[in-house]
Amino acid sequence: MNGTYSYGTGRRKSAVARVFIKPGSGVITVNNKPVDEFFSRETGRMVVRQPLELTGNLDRFDILVNIHGGGESGQAGAVRHGITRALIDFDATLKPVLSNAGLVTRDAREVERKKVGLRKARRRKQFSKR
């Protein structure tokens, strides 16, 4: 990686994304694969491009992402969070636009643990009156 990169770390559920952006032609690479190949679902691709579309920078930056952990949805959210932070690192004037869209805040929702005596986190065994 040569040149000047702006960096942002994104997290969502158990996924962690390290995002590097630099001025370029709009190529997004996730774990050495094009974004359209890495995220098989269209929703994942839309989530990843959301901060770029919102700020009008879709074709202005080359983005390199290293991601591990989590599933497809969590990884897409982590990449979005990382791109948002990297854009703010590159140009702080974009922060109000991204903040109003709710992209700067880390989504703190995590999977609730399974409790002893229950089937799942909150699901109880069926109650039989007789």
Curated annotation (Swiss-Prot):
Protein name: Small ribosomal subunit protein uS9
The UniProt record lists the keyword Hydrolase: no
Keyword Transmembrane among record annotations: no
Species this protein is from: Nitrosospira multiformis (strain ATCC 25196 / NCIMB 11849 / C 71)
A Gene Ontology molecular function term of the record: RNA binding
Similarity-based family: Belongs to the universal ribosomal protein uS9 family.
InterPro entries, A to Z: Ribosomal_Su5_D2-typ_SF, Ribosomal_uS9, Ribosomal_uS9_bac/plastid, Ribosomal_uS9_CS, Ribsml_uS5_D2-typ_fold_subgr
SUPFAM superfamilies: Ribosomal protein S5 domain 2-like (SSF54211)
GO cellular component terms listed in the entry, alphabetical order: cytosolic small ribosomal subunit
A Pfam family of this chain: Ribosomal_S9
Any GO BP: translation
Alphabetized HAMAP family for the sequence: Ribosomal_uS9_B
Alphabetic keyword roster: Ribonucleoprotein, Ribosomal protein
